């Protein structure tokens, strides 16, 4: 009997808040994030990113645009960390001197086995990060 070849599961992706904002506002690095953002079936969105992107869009583009982006983000899988992962994020923040949001978002990518797409240079030495510098 011939062996059945299974297709490998596509890798999950996570685009951080700055990446979302870069894409939806047509920034110079928007193309870097496009493939991951348009592949909604393999894209995870930390709940924290909903807040960060929503707030920035409200400030810079108003409620209608903010809500449109909020809806777009929810077409993907919105995820949250388990309590133990928050502790790991705190340790990572201390060890690597990361801001709280950066540590939580990086830990989310790690917990879900996703590649983190970012333009945040503070994450350049972290595992599982695909960086496009600003």
Per-range role (PLM):
Residues 52, 74-95:
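Acidic catalytic patch
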Residues 60-64, 96, 132-134:
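Short, hinge-like loop/turn segments at secondary-structure boundaries
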Residues 20-21, 50, 123-124:
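A generic structural signal for short hydrophobic patches within well-formed alpha-helices
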């Amino acid at each position: 009997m011939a062996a059945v070849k299974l297709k490998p599961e596509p890798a999950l992706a996570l685009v951080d808040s700055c990446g979302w904002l870069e894409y939806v506002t047509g920034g110079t690095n928007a193309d870097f994030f496009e493939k991951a953002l348009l592949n909604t079936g393999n894209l995870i969105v930390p709940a924290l990113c909903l807040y960060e992107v929503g707030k920035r869009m409200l400030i810079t583009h108003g409620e209608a645009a903010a809500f449109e982006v909020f809806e777009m983000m929810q077409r993907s899988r919105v995820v949250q960390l388990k309590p133990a992962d928050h502790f790991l994020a705190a340790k990572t923040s201390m060890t690597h001197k990361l801001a709280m949001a950066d540590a939580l978002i990086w830990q989310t990518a790690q917990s879900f086995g996703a590649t983190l797409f970012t333009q945040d240079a503070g994450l350049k030495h972290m595992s599982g990060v695909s960086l496009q510098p600003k």
